[in-house]
Amino acid sequence: MENKNVYSLVVAILNRGFSDVAMSAARNAGAKGGTVISARSSGLHEEETFFGISILPEKELVLILSTEETKAPIMRAIIKHVGIETEGGGIIFSLPVTDVEGIKAFEDFSKKQ
């Protein structure tokens, strides 16, 4: 049985302060909106300290629910404006979404399918 995903979750992990740029680019590429979450980086790099206090790099996560058709243009727009080679330092990826409830625009789209 084939499971065709109609939706994707586009995830962008950005340096703090670049979520507005990412959302503007995504909207211009077809996104209807998104969610921004504040985060801290934790990984391979040693923590910086300032007067003995650990300072972790601040990040922002941008989450955008998109249709499969708008996923690639949204990702390309975000990469162009805040990708890894820009000051935004963005890492962008997508995940398949199997079910969506409670979002009118997506519910209307599903009824057309």
Please identify what each model-predicted range represents.
Residues M1-Q113:
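Positively charged, small/polar-rich N-terminal and surface patches that mediate targeting and assembly
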